[in-house]
Structure formats: structure tokens, C-alpha cells
Amino acid sequence: RECGDEIPVRLVKGAYWDNEIKWSQENGVTGYPVFTRKAHSDLSYIACARYLLSDDTDGAIYPQFATHNAQTIMSIEHMNETHKRRIEYQRLHGMGDNLYDTLMKQKPGMVVRIYAPVGPHRDLLPYLVRRLLENGANSSFVHKLLDADTPVDELVVHPLKTAMRHEVYANDKIPLPPAMYEERKN
């Protein structure tokens, strides 16, 4: 800030979630280092976005939001109405095209960076598969949007309301690592 430069900070959500879950299970750790419910990841992302848009970071951080989630983008846009910060969105080449095309028509000047991963095949393929799985999951906004049986009010449920539906914080459908292989110590 004192030098007049802003540090670009890229906020991502869930990029290595499956790797963290698998590592925890293979190593038999007591719990998971990541949220096991999507709503909690969504809330955490929004909380971090709120901080990145706050006066505390103005002039020091250039917020970059990597997301293909329409509700997340709308939350960020709403929070930024107050601060009017210069921000950037980022999307993976081939994902979120229609969403961002529509937004850029509605908001000329919106900065959207399209990125394409590069690297050796052994690293690149797993990365792309993770992104496809993440964005094609049944819980994704686009999947619900295309499903004629999904009520409109279910498309725009705030993640806090979704999180509050559960009595237990952790997702009980994902067994804790020590319970994975009870016959042996991981």
C-alpha cells in the first residue's frame, strides 16, 4: 500500500477438495482439513470475498474471484455496490461461457480473465477432470437450472439457509478417515 501497488489475490473454492478428502482418508487423520458440506464452502468463500472487498484491503489487494457460480457472482456484485472496488472474475476456458457472456452484456467493463491450464499430461488431465466433476455435480446451479422439476426458489437459496438445514456440522455421509478401514490402522 505504501508503495502504491496492489497485490492480486485470487480466491478459489473447492479446487483441491477431493484431494484433501482422499489424503485424509489414506492417512487416517482424525478429521478433514476442508468443509464436508458445499454450503459451508460457499459461506466461507463469501466471507473471504467480503473481506477482500472491505476498506481494510483497499489500495493493498486487487481481488480476483475464480468462480462459475452465478449466486456467488451476484453476492460479490451486491457486496461491491458499496465499495465500488476494481475487481476481476476468472473462469476456466470452456466453462461459464453463457453466464459470463450474459453478465458482461449487463455490465459493460466487467473484467473477466479466461484461463487455460498448461502443463504435463499427468498433471493436466486430473486437474481438468476435477473441474468437470465440480461443475457437473448434481448440486451445481447450472444442473438445477436445466432441471424443469427444480422450483425457482430452490435455485436461489442462500448458503446459510442450506447450512442451517443440517443438525450436524460435518457431512455424515462422508465417513471420518479412521472409520474407513476399521480392520487396519491407516
Where are these predicted regions, by residue range?
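Positively charged, amphipathic and often flexible ligand-engagement surfaces
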Residues: R1-K185
